[in-house]
Amino acid sequence: MSSHDDARWMRLAVKLAWLCQPSATAYSVGAVIVAADGTELSRGFSRDSDRVVHAEESALGKLAPGAPGAPGAPDAPGDPRLPGATIYSTLEPCSKRKSRPRSCTELIIASGIRRVVIAWREPDLFVADCQGYELLEQAGLEVIELPAFSEQAAAPNRHLKFLSSERARGVCRHARIIRPSYRNATVCNFSHFLVIVALFRATGR
């Protein structure tokens, strides 16, 4: 996939995120799975089929119910197109899960998908220190972050207003330090800074 293709599919994922029913306890996320030849295989968004389903989980489950990347049947054969596919998600895939036995990171790895494109890293709001990015890389997947889409991806989550009580503690409260083995170490991830600016504007604070 080219950078132009990545931008095109991420724009679609952002549109899907806006379809989510807002929740005070979960993010609004959109996801699209695209084959190696550039055709769309599946799409999903948070809470599109039940109140706790995640976007990546939904997209995988629609494409191949019972496949390794789908809940409930980790040993079933997967869709043969998945190893060459890319999954686009507006948020870093979860690495810890309370509502399901397997995280979206685990589902993606099990599905055979080898390329993941995200718009922004998960803030430490519901689960501390999400490691989706790192775990995917450790499993050998190519993981790409598109900071240019961070504000757009955060916008459907403006109802959370998760910065309101943290404002006095500084803008880096929810920006995690990225480990040097994966990226250049930094105290305040620039994409998170853009997200924070967007959410302050959206909430009028």
Predicted ranges, named:
Residues 1-6, 139-147, 170, 184, ...:
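Catalytic cores of nucleic-acid editing and processing enzymes
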Residues 5-24:
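Short, basic/aromatic recognition patches
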Residues 25-29, 53, 168-170:
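Short, basic and Ser/Thr-rich N-terminal targeting/leader segments
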Residues 29-35:
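Short beta-strand scaffold segments in enzyme catalytic cores
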Residues 39-40, 182:
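Hydrophobic "anchor" residues
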Residues 41-152:
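Zn2+-dependent cytidine deaminase-like catalytic core
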Residues 154-191, 205:
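N-terminal nucleotide/polyanion-binding subdomain common to many enzyme families
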Residues 201-203:
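Short, intrinsically disordered C-terminal tails of secreted or membrane-associated proteins
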